[in-house]
Amino acid sequence: FFIMRGANSHLDFDLDLAKDESEKNPVYYLQYANARISNLLKRYDKDIVGDPSINLSLLKEKDEISLAKLLSEFPNKMDEVSKALEPRKLGTYLEDVASAYHKFYGNHKVIDPQNIELSFARKKLCEATKIILKNGLSILGITAPDKM
């Protein structure tokens, strides 16, 4: 909670919100996105046999492209955060990543045994999202559980 605010901004700590297991709690929201991806990757390995060669050009949907673009901003975002000494910006960025992931996940079938190539490309997008979330959370000193 403290990391999600600027150093000079006023904070009224809400203990009920800190305990809340919903999207209203920013830490829970980020951890939930990571756990959701972990669960999806386990299901993928059960439902899809083998991995085809990767073809990321299959990712053409607006939500897929938006998420991929957001993930590509991570190195620049880290540079910005470190130069400004504002971890709040990393927290905000990670919330944007989690939100984009949830939108993508809600709108598209990631695991489709009838379309293994697209499923594999989407799996790779999910894996990249998990890496960004896990690394970002670690930098902020927040755990990234695989189950919730």
Where are these regions (language model features)?
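Non-catalytic interaction-recognition regions
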Residues: 1-148
